[in-house]
């Protein structure tokens, strides 16, 4: 039973680790161009597209939940229809971004407010990379399908392939053709479409029979379209709450000065390290939870829930011990600024609480997606966001940055707690005792 979970989780963890490398590679290349404005342009551009990735992540999550249920039922035609529907909607939204490029660019630059010397380079990077949004969102639909049919190896291979293509193309455009920011952007663009093309090829090679069973009439069916948009709409709004909390966390850190901002940015990496692994088990919850829920195998479904939380508790213990013992050393690896390192010691105890505060939210998110209980995810995120802002508003004047970290950890903890309290009612309403 654990092997089934690990078979999904481990490739997903590898994929999660490779995703940030696309932006990191760009930063490393421009970091050797001798102009700080190039670095700023890439940082701003990467942040814009990371937000797009995050906000439209519902295309992957909603697809994986519905596909895993259809897969568990043995409904190959249903799986095919879900895939094509997600793919068409993802490509459609992506093309809308391309068509609305001037408006999106204006809004993004107004929000980010880059300095005058950075602005033209940031616009150049944006104007090239925006053409990759259709491939990026189309790939979300494909990845949701692959997770739904219990195959996370394909997304892993595609992620690794994308990074290799990005490195080769960006280096070639910059050092062989003499390009600057535009070369780095083109490398990213080529990598995105290369990954999308590889994913389509692997889809045809391994799951061609699924695609042949697709019915365009069923894809456009009103009831199924409504279900798709209801589920994904809930996840979309839920994601906006997450974005709002993270934006507030970063913005409040910035208001406290450069040192506190640096401390919060570096300490947040501990949460990121934890999330890479926990997201892998969340994906396993989506895949195996949805499969056994769709198949109506209640005993297996409950068993998978227990095993997932067993892995979650084990990882909490390991991460907590690792952070307590090695947290200071990790901070010194992340920065050599003595002032930042000294300031971080005051807040390091909050890092130790990250695993136990956040574990349940990750596991429940995967399971809720698997059974398409998206409204529960939305409600838990709403309640948690309210708690975050209340704690921040009430305690920040007296507690300062400690209040900000308390609010963030409570946001994670409350999400998991609310989902725990709602779970029994939800599964009973779905016919699972």
Regions from the language model: what does each represent?
Residues 24-28, 107, 141-145, 167-172, ...:
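Alpha-helical transmembrane segments of multipass membrane proteins
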Residues 128-148, 155-166, 184-199, 279-282, ...:
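Short runs within selected transmembrane alpha-helices of multi-pass transporters and secretion channels
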Residues 7-26, 128, 139, 161-162, ...:
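Transmembrane helical elements of multi-pass membrane transporters/channels
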Residues 39-99, 136-155, 250, 261-327, ...:
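Small-residue-rich hydrophobic transmembrane alpha-helices
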Residues 1-9, 67-134, 176-236, 289-354, ...:
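Short alpha-helical transmembrane segments in multi-pass integral membrane proteins
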Residues 21-40, 109-116, 172-179, 240-273, ...:
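Helix-terminus/linker motif at the lipid-water interface of multi-pass membrane proteins
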Residues 1-33, 47-62, 66, 91-98, ...:
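N-terminal transmembrane alpha-helices
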């Amino acid at each position: 039973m654990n092997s089934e979970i690990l078979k999904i989780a481990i490739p997903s963890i590898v994929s999660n680790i490779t995703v940030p490398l696309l932006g990191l590679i760009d930063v490393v290349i421009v970091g050797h161009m001798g102009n700080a404005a190039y670095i700023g342009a890439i940082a701003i551009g990467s942040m814009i597209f990371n937000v797009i990735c995050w906000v439209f992540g519902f295309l992957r999550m909603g697809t994986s939940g519905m596909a895993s249920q259809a897969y568990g039922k043995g409904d190959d035609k249903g799986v095919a229809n879900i895939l094509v529907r997600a793919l068409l909607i993802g490509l459609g939204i992506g093309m809308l971004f391309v068509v609305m490029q001037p408006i999106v660019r204006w809004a993004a630059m107004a929000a980010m407010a880059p300095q005058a010397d950075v602005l033209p380079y940031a616009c150049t990077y944006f104007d090239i990379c925006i053409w990759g949004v259709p491939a990026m969102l189309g790939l979300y639909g494909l990845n949701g399908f692959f997770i739904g049919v219990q195959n996370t190896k394909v997304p892993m291979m595609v992620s690794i392939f994308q990074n290799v293509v990005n490195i080769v193309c960006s280096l070639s455009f910059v050092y062989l053709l003499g390009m600057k920011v535009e070369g780095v952007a083109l490398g990213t663009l080529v990598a995105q479409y290369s990954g999308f093309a590889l994913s389509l090829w692997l889809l045809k090679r391994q799951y061609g029979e699924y695609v042949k069973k697709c019915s365009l009439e069923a894809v456009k069916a009103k009831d199924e379209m409504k279900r798709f948009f209801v589920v994904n709409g809930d996840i979309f709004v839920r994601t906006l709450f997450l974005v709002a909390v993270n934006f507030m966390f970063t913005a409040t850190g910035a208001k406290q000065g450069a040192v506190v901002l640096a401390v919060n940015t570096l300490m947040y990496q501990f949460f990121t390290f934890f999330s890479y692994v926990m997201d892998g088990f969340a994906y396993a919850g989506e895949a195996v939870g949805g499969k056994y829920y769709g198949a109506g195998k209640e005993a297996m479904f409950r068993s998978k829930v227990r095993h997932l939380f067993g892995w979650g508790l084990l990882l909490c213990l390991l991460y907590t011990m690792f952070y307590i013992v090695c947290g200071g050393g990790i901070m010194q690896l992340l920065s050599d600024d003595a002032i930042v390192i000294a300031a971080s010691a005051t807040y390091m105890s909050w890092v130790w609480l990250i695993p136990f505060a956040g574990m349940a939210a990750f596991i429940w998110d995967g399971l809720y997606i698997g059974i398409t209980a998206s409204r529960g995810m939305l409600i838990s995120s709403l309640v948690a966001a309210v708690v975050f802002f209340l704690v921040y508003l009430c305690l920040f004047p007296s507690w300062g940055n400690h209040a900000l970290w308390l609010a963030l950890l409570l946001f994670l903890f409350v999400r998991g707690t609310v989902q725990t309290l709602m779970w029994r009612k939800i599964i009973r309403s779905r016919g699972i005792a």
